[in-house]
């Protein structure tokens, strides 16, 4: 056995031992509702990272089954192309297990678990199988999240111990979303129809093409950007460049400077997500995103959908594209027959953890 193999084996064994020790440790009785993640490392309890497979491992199953028997806040960390979420089993209540303020603390990458948001699996309503709610890393609540809904589907399969292909009806703030777990482990999601009417997005920019806001002028930071606005249940402002700079090289952008100026622009009364796009070919796009309430992230599923819609409306791309994001590629198709957008991409569990509350 090589030294590298031996080290890896020892690491896995240590992780399993840590998980077993945690499972045997009784959770302290709560005195009042307060997350003990910030500023108190001795009170924080985390499980060592472990790999997750389907069917789920015995260690993963044991951890998930502890939910009903202990008074600790259990979670599973998931990621989709680097867009990461703290997933919580909230099927027993329509009230989230943590407040927006507590969610922001959990998402803190220095004093908390670290994530782009907290997602709750809640009871379904209006004929849906489940309800999905999200708190962003700043505590705000978005209507939907494309990468998050893929993680949501994989988390449900883990909770219900489901194998093979499955689809679910998910109630979200953006309406009914239907993800399908495929045989290769990827999740294909029917994201519904894009909303193009300016007031419904919402944006105060005037319509330029029928009722749609396509290649409208938007003054930001001394430049006139040409933007197309799309809602995927949440607002998106898509730009391929300024009037002065027709071809955008997205890697050259400093998102931390320009992103907030789009997000909080007066033309977007509900704020906006912003996608900066580079056209590689008519079926291949590259984007970077500044997300409303989360900032620069490695991926945004609804953003990738909005980008393809905008590219089609501007005559830059076909209806089926690969969209490269910093975290990896997504397959996006805007079908002409039903006007629905379909997104396909990965989602996987990263680790399991607990926080006393």
UniProtKB/Swiss-Prot annotation:
Q: Which GO terms describe its molecular function?
A: diaminopimelate epimerase activity
Top-level EC class as recorded in UniProt: isomerase
Q: Which EC number(s) does UniProt give?
A: 5.1.1.7
Q: Which InterPro entries match?
A: DAP_epimerase_AS, DAP_epimerase_DapF
Compartments annotated for it: namely: Plastid, Chloroplast
- Which residues are named in the active-site annotation? 145, 300
Q: Which domain of life is it from?
A: Eukaryota
Note whether Nucleotide-binding occurs among the keywords: no
Pathway-wise, it operates in:
Amino-acid biosynthesis; L-lysine biosynthesis via DAP pathway; DL-2,6-diaminopimelate from LL-2,6-diaminopimelate: step 1/1
Presequence positions on this chain: 1-47
Q: Which Pfam families match?
A: DAP_epimerase
Alphabetical GO biological process terms: lysine biosynthetic process via diaminopimelate
User: Keyword set for this entry?
Assistant: Amino-acid biosynthesis, Chloroplast, Isomerase, Lysine biosynthesis, Plastid, Transit peptide
- Annotated Gene Ontology cellular component terms: chloroplast; cytosol
Query: GTP-binding among the record's keywords?
Result: no
Q: Which reaction does it catalyse?
A: (2S,6S)-2,6-diaminopimelate = meso-2,6-diaminopimelate
Q: Which PANTHER family match?
A: DIAMINOPIMELATE EPIMERASE, DIAMINOPIMELATE EPIMERASE, CHLOROPLASTIC
Q: Which family does it belong to?
A: Belongs to the diaminopimelate epimerase family.
Q: What name has this protein been given in UniProt?
A: Putative diaminopimelate epimerase, chloroplastic
| Species, as recorded | Oryza sativa subsp. indica (Rice)
Q: Which gene encodes it?
A: DAPF
């Amino acid at each position: 056995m090589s030294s590298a193999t031996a080290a890896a084996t020892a690491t896995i064994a240590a992780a399993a031992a840590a998980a077993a020790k945690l499972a045997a440790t009784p959770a302290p009785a709560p005195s009042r509702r307060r997350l003990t993640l910030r500023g108190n490392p001795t009170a924080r309890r985390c499980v060592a990272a472990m790999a997750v497979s389907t069917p789920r491992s015995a260690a993963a199953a044991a951890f998930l089954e502890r939910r009903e028997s202990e008074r600790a806040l259990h979670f599973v960390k998931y990621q989709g192309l680097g867009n990461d979420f703290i997933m919580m089993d909230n099927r027993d209540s329509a009230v989230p297990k943590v407040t927006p303020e507590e969610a922001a603390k959990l998402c803190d990458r220095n004093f908390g678990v670290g994530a782009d948001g907290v997602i709750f699996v809640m009871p379904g309503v209006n004929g849906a199988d489940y309800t999905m709610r999200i708190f962003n890393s700043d505590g705000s609540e978005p209507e939907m999240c494309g990468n998050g809904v893929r993680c949501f589907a994989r988390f449900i399969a883990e909770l219900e111990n489901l194998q093979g292909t499955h689809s679910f009806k998910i109630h979200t703030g953006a309406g009914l979303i239907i993800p399908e777990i495929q045989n290769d482990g990827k999740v294909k999601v029917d994201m519904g129809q894009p909303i193009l009417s300016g007031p419904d997005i919402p944006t105060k920019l005037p319509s330029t093409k029928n009722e749609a806001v396509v290649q409208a002028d938007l003054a930001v930071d001394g430049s006139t950007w040409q933007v197309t606005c799309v809602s995927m249940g949440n607002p998106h402002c898509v730009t391929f460049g300024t009037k002065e700079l027709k071809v955008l090289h997205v890697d050259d952008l400093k998102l931390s400077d320009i992103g907030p100026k789009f997000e909080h622009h007066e033309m977007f009364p509900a704020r906006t997500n912003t996608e900066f796009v580079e056209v590689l070919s008519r079926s291949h796009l590259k984007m970077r995103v500044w997300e409303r309430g989360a900032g620069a992230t490695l991926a945004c599923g609804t953003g990738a959908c909005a980008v393809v819609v905008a590219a089609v409306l501007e005559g830059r791309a076909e209806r089926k594209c690969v969209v490269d994001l910093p975290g990896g590629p997504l397959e996006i198709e805007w079908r002409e027959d039903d006007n629905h957008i379909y997104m396909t991409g990965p989602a996987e569990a990263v680790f399991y953890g607990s926080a006393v509350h």
